[in-house]
């Protein structure tokens, strides 16, 4: 559960309505893979990840980034039940994919950076604080099934 004020919730959802999920998702996942290269081991089937340009131009990275942000959108619609919303994804990433749950926090922080880059002055410090709460809540929900 994420505790947002009514004003924060309105602001987060208003900004999210302007997000180009295709572009932002690909950029966020791509940046994660470039900035934290050890995360690439989970994406070996994606082909060429040999350089920042290869990662950022990789169509599989872009497609998966879009998928990730689609799930994030679902989370925004269910802020009062993030653990339930992400239960199956948590189980998948824990039991089958064996993803380090710290990677969820890293991706959330990268997403905040990408939103700031894309929205400039509209992404105020207050907006950042609200989004940090959301990405922390999503990361916590995704890590829920880990033992």
Swiss-Prot record:
Q: Name one GO cellular component term.
A: cytosol
Organ and tissue specificity: Red blood cells.
Q: Which parts of the sequence carry Phosphoserine?
A: 51
Q: What is the effect of changing residue 94 to G?
A: In Sant' Antioco
Recite the UniProt keywords alphabetically.
Acetylation, Heme, Iron, Metal-binding, Oxygen transport, Phosphoprotein, Transport
Q: Name one Pfam family in it.
A: Globin
Phenotype upon changing residue 118 to D? In LiangCheng
What top-level branch of life does the organism fall under?
Answer: Eukaryota
Q: Which residues form the Globin domain?
A: 3-147
Gene3D superfamilies reported in the protein's UniProt record: Globins
Q: Which residues carry this modification: N-acetylalanine?
A: 2
Outcome after substituting residue 122 to V: In Manzanares; unstable
Q: Record's SUPFAM superfamilies? A: Globin-like
**GO MF annotations in UniProt:** heme binding; hemoglobin alpha binding; metal ion binding; oxygen binding; oxygen carrier activity
Identify the residues that bind heme b.
Answer: 64, 93
Q: Which GO terms describe its biological process?
A: carbon dioxide transport; cellular oxidant detoxification; hydrogen peroxide catabolic process; oxygen transport
Chain's role: Involved in oxygen transport from the lung to the various peripheral tissues.
How does the record describe its quaternary structure? Heterotetramer of two alpha chains and two delta chains in adult hemoglobin A2 (HbA2). HbA2 represents less than 3.5% of adult hemoglobin.
The family note in this entry says: Belongs to the globin family.
Q: What is this protein called?
A: Hemoglobin subunit delta
